[in-house]
Amino acid sequence: MILEARDISFSYERKGAELFSNIKFKVENNERVWVPGPSGYGKTTLCKILAGYLEPCKGQILLDGKPLPKKGYCPVQMIWQHPERAVNPRLKMENILSDGGQVENRIIEGLGIEEDWLNRYPQELSGGELQRFCIARALGK
């Protein structure tokens, strides 16, 4: 898969100052990317656009040459820094995990997710245990 940003620009107010403009890049399959910068410079906003949470003011995001889906599952996933804010506290972990579609057993085992954790609620897990579920969910489908 190739994730491509084509000339994307963004501002929080449609006619306000741009947070960033005309960004272009491609991320190839199995390539890792690092986005450094101080707080407030748009790193998280850029990631939200790449994952389809926000729309750019200009430009487009493509996955294998096609726009990201507007509805349903998006194959571009974001793993949030604070896992407790990324899950529904009313759902058991088994349901939260299935939000990402089918997660392979090798991923669950590789992350060290224990079977009895599946029947717990998020607040019954440590931050590290909860983050493992968020990573597994992002790797699903």
Give the residues covered by each predicted segment.
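A short, flexible loop at the N-terminus of ABC-type nucleotide-binding domains that lies
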Residues: I2-A5, S9-N22, E114
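The feature captures the beta-strand-to-loop junction immediately N-terminal to the Walker
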Residues: P36-P38
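Helix-to-loop junction immediately C-terminal to a conserved catalytic motif
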Residues: A51
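Conserved ABC transporter NBD signature motif
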Residues: G59-G72, V103
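ABC ATPase NBD coupling module
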Residues: K66-Q77, R85, L91
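Q-loop/switch helix immediately C-terminal to the Walker
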Residues: H82, P89-E104
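Conserved ABC ATPase signature
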Residues: N95, Y121-L125, E129
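Conserved ABC ATPase "signature" region
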Residues: V103-D116
